[in-house]
Amino acid sequence: MLFGISYYRKKILKVSTVNEKLRYKVPSNLNLSLQNLIITKILRRGKYLILFFRDSKLCLLIHLGMTGYFRLSDELVEKKHDHVIFFLKKKILIFNDIRKFGFIKIYCDKEIFFSSHLINMGVEPLGTNFNLNYFNSFRKRTVDLKGLLMNQSFIAGLGNIYCSEILFDARLSPLRKINSLNNLEIRNIVKSTKKILKKAISFGGTTIKNFIVSEEKIGYFKNKLKVYSRDKKNCLRCSKGILIKKIRQSGRSTFFCEKCQK
């Protein structure tokens, strides 16, 4: 998350690559391409960030991966796992990623939304396009509910933690098939999705292991989780003795209550 960068739309004086071996190799021409450009606009699409520049047809596509983050500093103090350093006017912007699943790519601004990363991406969960009518266009599918919510071509940016929390809030089982849902249940999914995401944003996201927000702050929504990572603990909605269950779906952990999520 690039909280804070929008306030520092400064000229890039130079870019230094400390380690090029991220998910994709850092472009060798990164410094040459970006030197003296001014950041003018920052967009988010799903889990991707896009940086645009004044008087340039180039843009940057950035993915933070599992553990990546940016930090702004007044002076260069390098830390372990720093990979790319952007020297701005009066500020230094540093990309750090412990697991190196993140990446930085250069694209032409007219091609970026047609890139393999973005072209098939679904609607934004907080946008008006995510609604009953949109959901109904997928309603004949026989996939399970959580699987659809995790599908980036259906809805952009939802991760494993939030899917479990959304379905708990909507009182729906992650195992339900899409073609079994009625209109009321779909409306509840849409409503719960927007509710949980807005609440998570207000708490700065969710820090489980390594995730931090800019300026190296953690996300406090971890303290508000009602089902995720609470397996074998009492359901916060049901009576005592009803425990949260953990299962595996498509290789990912899912947490839910068998009693109140139907």
Residue ranges and their predicted role:
Residues F53-G157, Y162-D169, K177, L184:
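Phosphate/anion-contacting hairpin/loop surfaces
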Residues L13-S16, G147-S153, T206-I212:
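Short coil/turn segments at secondary-structure boundaries
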Residues M1-I104, V227-Y228, K233-R237, S250-K262:
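A cross-family signal for N-terminal binding/gating loops and helix N-caps
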Residues S173-E185, S202-K209:
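Short conserved catalytic/interaction loops centered on acidic-Pro-aromatic/His motifs
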Residues N136, S164, R171-L175, N234, ...:
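A feature for loop-to-transmembrane-helix boundaries and adjacent hydrophobic helices
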